[in-house]
């Protein structure tokens, strides 16, 4: 904790914005005396009631709130004397960089974290910030101290932090107000030596991940110690450190003759031993596997490793399973009981008494079961294999050994060698039982790819050309040609007799990450549950359970395919509902496809008859229609920018409930299409959408036209029928912020032929002619227009900041029957309140609408259009 500071976090942040180039104050001749040690509480604010612990998680609150005795750092002697340089830090950590007179750089990292630093300014001071801040209690405040002996025992480069309290000392200069009294971890910052002299651990260069990946790509002499990197990742699995993204590594270069060997240095151990427990996280864990808990169980491997997959997969793919297993065994053997005990005893004695015995036993159990987690990790790395060459000229030989295995050997090419191969740069054999797809990235240089051997190509192969003149030679007799070459350049050559499929398009650079965050997924799949319990007055409660599966593929954004399925039951009426939908984004040449299969026994609509002058003298329940519906609809889709085209077929089976003992308008009139009705036909739609935000647009247009046609087949014995519709929306804002928006919309529909009553052009309800009952008017044509003015009034701080405002509207519409439209236009007006959380990704509204037939209230998501 920081005994001196009591200002709100926003004031702390203001202090941190002080200019960093001020001349540091010189120490006074007689600096004030500071105690050797103090007793502090790392995070008193994390002390909560039993209910909060149950709901939000106990985490490591006991460690945060127990008083601990900690040394005060002596700025005159630590590191030979420390000179503060600048502030730094990540998303939530306060960090002071300092220069030691011993020639080393040091960083002082706050043990406590400050959630406000890692969130958008609009979210600061909200309940959202308070929740995130409280979840820092799931971090282990002294967990980083445990890591050095573990890493040392397995040969991974590491820093060696110590826990100290920064003094209230004028030698901290302008940083004293912010950091004086702060409980910190002080560690050496890995750095390279001056004038090519050895630096940290004898290395010659230290770089971040982005620069390291550039080094690997630029020159084949740069090689990663991949076994050492795997060892570091196994320690992450051991301690449950889920925060090893691309920004949490340093890379050290060591000269080895003509080759440069790079070794990984893990950074920032704030989330080792993290304990994200609590009842609130149980359902959330189904959606977010990174909500991990440190225990004796085998860790959630996806959750622990996910943040580093973008580098794990290309950097570890060269390690075959036998070598992988041997590394796991070696790590287990080196992590002896005494090493684990030594590591745990580095915690403060007060933490040791509370957590030491439990942590020791948990680490031993996780060590003994490390191979189980490592096997899962191997499958993640090997399933979709990313193989990278360099910008030098290379020759890649792919040799099919048999039906199950293919070997890849990459040779560096010597510029003055006619043979072309100088030395092996990379080699590995893949097995279809482990690997589903291989992606070979050639990068720059004039590369040659040689395909040879024979067998069934059960592993899909994608070859991604680089910037040079690439050449593919195919002498293989591989069956089931499942090989693709991607290159948009005109220098790449391919034997026309080859069965390789040439795709003339650029593939994205797979290592183009950094400050923009992780790459979009392009492999694997993700299942998510889809429960729902909606309630309506017509239906009662619906108990619904389902799931979605999102599949990701190469060059397919935002996904490759999407599956949803589910079923529900309405106990009041003993009705069922089930649905299945499947969507493929790119079936062939930019054309997607979808398939919908659904049954609903809970469909309801209103039917008052045809025309503008229909009466509504009975209770509304008299006009209610209960209908069962089975729908089968395959579609194909393509798009060009903001324009989308849908074409498909549709089969629909309808069953209208006309029970005689329940008097209703539908049972007394028996319109065409009541009872059982089967129909089949075709549908089409074209859409142009330039709206800035579909949920709450302030600018842009939305244009859509569609058609449906059903020939005289099945129960359409009165002849073919069909319909067309067109819809146009425009949004006009009178300020850059979109605080005042005028929304205008018009929609028209025409149905021809003898059609079932439920295919009529309806008006009425929340989306078409507010203020009138749902489906109040029906005809063979309809015309509807709406104008709505939306005004932003201000912001409201809830869980997250909400924008809120008011709106006013007027609607008008009419239906036509055989060209006639007696009674003319139906008009309504009204207004309401609207609210939207940050960035308006969702909008909710409350609407009151007045029409000649009464007043209606609507509650729901979005606006009327």
Positions of PLM-derived features:
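C-terminal catalytic region of ATP-dependent kinase domains
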Residues: 136-137, 253-427, 432-439, 445, ...
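Outer-membrane beta-barrel "beta-signal"
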Residues: 683, 833-835, 854-865
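Residue-level signature of outer-membrane beta-barrel architecture
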Residues: 465, 533-535, 549-551, 569, ...
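Conserved ATP-binding subdomain of kinase catalytic cores across diverse folds
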Residues: 71-209, 232, 236, 240-241, ...
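C-terminal outer-membrane beta-barrel translocator/porin domains of Gram-negative envelope proteins
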Residues: 515-525, 575-583, 593-612, 616-625, ...
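Outer-membrane beta-barrel initiation region
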Residues: 277, 464, 471-605, 673-698, ...
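Boundary at the C-terminal end of the N-terminal hydrophobic targeting segment
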Residues: 24-25, 29
């Amino acid at each position: 904790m920081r005994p001196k500071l009591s200002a709100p976090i926003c004031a702390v942040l203001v202090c941190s914005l002080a200019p960093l180039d001020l001349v540091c104050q010189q120490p006074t001749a007689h600096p004030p005396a500071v105690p050797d040690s103090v007793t502090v509480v790392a995070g008193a604010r994390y002390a909560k009631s039993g209910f909060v612990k149950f709901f939000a998680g106990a985490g490591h609150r006991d460690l945060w709130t127990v008083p601990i005795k900690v040394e005060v750092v002596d700025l005159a002697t630590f590191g030979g004397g420390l000179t503060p340089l600048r502030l730094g830090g990540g998303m939530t950590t306060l960090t002071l960089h300092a220069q030691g007179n011993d020639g080393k750089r040091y960083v002082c990292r706050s043990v406590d974290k400050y959630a406000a630093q890692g969130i958008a300014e609009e979210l600061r001071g909200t309940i959202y910030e308070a929740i995130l801040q409280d979840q820092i209690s799931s971090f282990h405040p002294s967990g980083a101290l445990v890591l050095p002996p573990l890493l040392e025992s397995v040969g991974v480069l590491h820093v060696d932090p110590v826990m100290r309290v920064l003094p209230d000392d004028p030698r901290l200069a302008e940083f004293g107000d912010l950091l004086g009294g702060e409980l910190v971890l002080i560690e050496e910052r890995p750095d390279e030596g001056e004038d090519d002299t050895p630096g940290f651990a004898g290395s010659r260069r230290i770089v971040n991940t982005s620069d390291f990946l550039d080094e690997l790509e630029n020159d084949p002499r740069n090689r990663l110690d991949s076994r050492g990197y795997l060892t570091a990742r196994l320690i992450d699995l051991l301690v449950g450190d889920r925060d090893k993204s691309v920004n949490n590594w340093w890379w050290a270069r060591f000269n080895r003759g003509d080759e440069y060997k790079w070794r990984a240095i893990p950074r920032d151990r704030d989330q080792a031993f993290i304990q994200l427990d609590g009842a609130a996280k149980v359902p959330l864990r189904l959606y977010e596997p990174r909500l991990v808990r440190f225990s004796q169980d085998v860790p959630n491997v996806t959750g622990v490793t996910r943040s580093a997959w973008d580098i794990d997969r290309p950097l570890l793919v060269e390690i075959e399973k036998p070598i992988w297993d041997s590394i796991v065994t070696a790590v287990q053997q080196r992590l002896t009981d005494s090493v684990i005990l030594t590591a745990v005893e580095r915690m403060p004695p007060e933490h040791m008494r509370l957590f030491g015995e439990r942590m020791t036993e948990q680490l031993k159990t996780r060590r003994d079961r490390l191979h189980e987690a490592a096997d899962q990790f191997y499958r993640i790395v090997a399933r979709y294999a990313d193989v990278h060459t360099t910008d030098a000229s290379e020759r890649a030989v792919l040799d099919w050994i048999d039906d199950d295995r293919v070997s890849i050997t990459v040779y560096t090419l010597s510029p003055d060698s006619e043979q072309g191969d100088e030395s092996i740069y990379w080699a590995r054999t893949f097995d279809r039982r482990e690997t589903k797809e291989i992606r070979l990235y050639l990068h720059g240089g004039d590369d040659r790819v040689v395909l040879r051997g024979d067998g069934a190509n059960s592993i899909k192969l994608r070859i991604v050309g680089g910037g040079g003149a690439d050449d593919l030679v195919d002498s293989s007799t591989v069956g089931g040609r499942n090989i693709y070459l991607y290159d948009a350049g005109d220098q790449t050559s391919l034997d026309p007799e080859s069965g390789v499929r040439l795709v003339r398009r650029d593939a994205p650079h797979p290592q183009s990450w950094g400050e923009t965050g992780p790459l979009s997924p392009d492999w694997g799949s993700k299942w998510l549950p889809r429960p729902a319990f909606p309630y309506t007055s017509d239906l009662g409660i619906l108990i619904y359970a389902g799931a979605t599966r999102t599949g990701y593929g190469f060059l397919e954004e935002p996904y490759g395919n999407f599956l949803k399925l589910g079923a529900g039951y309405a106990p009041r009426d003993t009705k069922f509902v089930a649905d299945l939908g499947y969507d493929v984004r790119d079936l062939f040449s930019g054309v997607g496809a979808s398939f919908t299969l659904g049954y609903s026994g809970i469909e309801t609509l209103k039917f008052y008859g045809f025309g503008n002058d229909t009466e509504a003298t009975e209770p509304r329940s008299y006009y209610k229609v209960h209908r069962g519906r089975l729908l089968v609809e395959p579609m194909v889709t393509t798009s060009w920018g903001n324009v989308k085209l849908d074409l498909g077929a549709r089969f629909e089976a309808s069953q209208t409930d006309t029970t005689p003992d329940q008097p209703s308008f539908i049972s007394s009139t028996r319109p065409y299409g009541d009872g059982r009705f089967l129909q089949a036909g075709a549908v089409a739609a074209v859409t142009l959408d330039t709206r800035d935000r579909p949920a709450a647009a302030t600018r842009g247009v939305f244009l859509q036209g569609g058609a449906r046609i059903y020939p005289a087949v099945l129960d359409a014995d009165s002849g073919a029928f069909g319909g067309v519709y067109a819809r146009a929306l425009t949004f006009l804002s009178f300020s850059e912020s979109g605080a005042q928006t005028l929304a205008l919309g018009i929609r028209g529909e025409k149905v021809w032929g003898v059609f079932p009553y439920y295919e009529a052009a309806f008006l009425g309800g929340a989306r078409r002619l507010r203020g009138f009952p749902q489906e109040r008017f029906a005809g063979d044509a309809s015309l509807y227009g709406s104008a709505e003015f939306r005004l932003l009034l201000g912001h409201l701080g809830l869980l997250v900041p909400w924008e809120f405002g008011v709106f006013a509207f007027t609607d008008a519409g009419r239906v036509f029957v055989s060209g006639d439209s007696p009674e003319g236009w139906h008009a309504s007006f009204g207004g309401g309140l609207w609210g939207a959380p940050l960035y308006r990704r969702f909008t909710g509204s409350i609407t009151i609408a007045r029409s000649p037939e009464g007043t209606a209230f609507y509650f729901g998501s979005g606006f009327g259009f």
